């Protein structure tokens, strides 16, 4: 589950919104007993009258703490209980929060499909990341979008990485909607991944779209 909070304020010509999400997998994080180190914190601004930057968002996310590194159940000799190592997305008996090797919900938790040993488990669920996005429409015909994500990865508490691994992702997108051809638009997107978790990769997309009204 999660605790979600947001605060928005509307100015005469722009709008700002700050939001906070605190997620949990068990009682230790539900009661905030072990702090609020793992979270999603974001800030978003909308500028509808600014053609160059219509909106931008900045987010910080951490899944690194997971209630701490120590797990100890109660015993006769040591009655104190420590509920650490929550091990997000993982489970001892089944394959965890995934479907056909792809993680569900969170795009930055490394999916099991990328495991080189072909084992269906999560080898990297302790991350810290920054995400930045902006979009704009400088003219009536052209629009753009930019997404940047930078992550640091620690593996898991049970099988940590030898070093902190970095992975960065970039997306640049341009759209063109000519006035001469009503209903037609073209979008070109280029994406690049650079890092030590998923390696380096490059991809592109070209999309042509035609919209029309059947009632006319």
Regions found by a protein language model. Name each.
Residues 2-3, 8-216:
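Outer-membrane beta-barrel pore domains
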